[in-house]
A protein has these predicted regions:
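Extended catalytic cores of very large enzyme megasubunits
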Residues: 1-339
Length: 339
């Protein structure tokens, strides 16, 4: 059977060039066809066109000149849409958002709501970064007279959720848990991805983990000083450790597992826009990949959408005066679609 989809054709209001399939290797084409194409799409160029038209549409009005440029950029491998935009943009499946950052409250209702939110976010194609630093630590009294089991067993629930909920074959559920360096469970948290040592029911082998460092802690490491682990519920010191020993625990875990992520939360909040500070907002964690810092709280789940430029073609796209501006407009439009 002869493929009539060759050369330049009209598609979704713009011109696409099926010959640009050769810009992708076999593995790339096979992956796109297996996971990214929508309904009657048969070629990567059609997916690029769909995402381009979607990214060029603002409040129902499409800028087809922008769509044509976005298609040219993507089909020329100057940049690539994120997985949620390329797989979900312009379709009725999933969301175009790459990352969600949410907050875990210190209550049974809050934990239940967090689990429920994770189900919907993971099955819509987004990666999640959750902040656990305000959940009371192991052994602290609860309002019902019992003793808390701490945050780790509840993280283990999320660990199972990420295996169970995903967006079909396109994107598996993925989650990064963040905790403050002063939390009493920090030593156990550092090692939750290690298969050996400790209770298997308090391991999270399918999660990523990140730690919020502070200027005060880093100074304590430099000074080889003591470091207090403070329960977020009682605000009392539960344990005192050596800061440098804790630092080396993190370094050893990173050598063995590649994680935990480490971010300086003080530096992040120092850079928070003054308009958000005036609203009492605060950065509590980063996202799944430790690349985005946005304010979160119990009422505020942050979102971000992404795309990536290809430095292999820097000499080509760096000469284009509207390339970066077009990508920013595209991402703004994607956020507007989500809203």
């Amino acid at each position: 059977m002869v493929d009539d989809k060759v050369g330049i054709k009209e598609y979704l209001g713009i011109k696409i060039n099926y010959s640009n399939e050769r810009n992708l290797d076999k593995f790339s084409l096979d992956t796109l066809k297996d996971r990214y194409l929508w309904e009657n799409e048969t070629h990567a160029q059609e997916a690029f066109a769909r995402a381009s038209v979607y990214g060029a549409t603002y409040k129902g009005v499409t800028d087809f000149e922008l769509a044509q440029r976005l298609y040219h950029y993507s089909s020329s491998c100057w940049f690539m849409f994120s997985t949620p935009i390329l797989s979900n943009g312009g379709t009725s499946r999933g969301l175009p958002i790459s990352c969600f950052l949410n907050y875990v409250p210190d209550s049974r209702g809050g934990l239940s709501n967090h689990f429920d939110e994770n189900i919907w976010l993971a099955s819509s194609g987004g990666g999640i970064g959750g902040f656990w630093g305000d959940v009371r630590s192991n052994g602290i009294s609860t309002a019902h007279g019992s003793k808390s089991t701490g945050s780790i067993p509840f993280m283990h629930v999320v660990d199972s959720q990420m295996l169970a909920f995903n967006q079909g074959v396109t994107r598996r559920g993925s989650y990064a848990a963040y905790m403050d360096i002063s939390h009493p469970e920090i030593e156990e948290f550092i090692n939750i991805r290690k298969e050996s040592g400790g209770d298997i029911n308090r391991k999270c082998l399918n999660l990523h983990n990140g730690i919020n460092l502070t200027n005060e802690f880093l100074q304590a490491v430099e000074d080889d000083a003591e470091w207090r682990l403070i329960d977020p519920k009682t605000h009392e010191a539960v344990k005192v450790v050596n800061a440098r020993d804790l630092w080396w625990q993190m370094i050893n875990a990173r050598a063995e597992t590649g994680e935990p992520y480490m971010i300086n939360i003080d530096r992040c909040n120092a850079a928070l826009p003054k308009e958000q500070k005036a609203l009492g907002l605060e950065i509590k964690q980063s996202n799944l990949c430790s690349e985005i810092t946005l304010a979160t709280n119990e009422e505020r789940t942050a979102v971000c959408c992404l795309s990536s430029v290809n430095l292999e073609y820097f000499d080509e796209w760096s000469e284009n005066p509207v390339f970066i501006d077009d990508l920013i407009t595209m991402l703004d439009n994607v956020i507007q679609h989500y809203i």
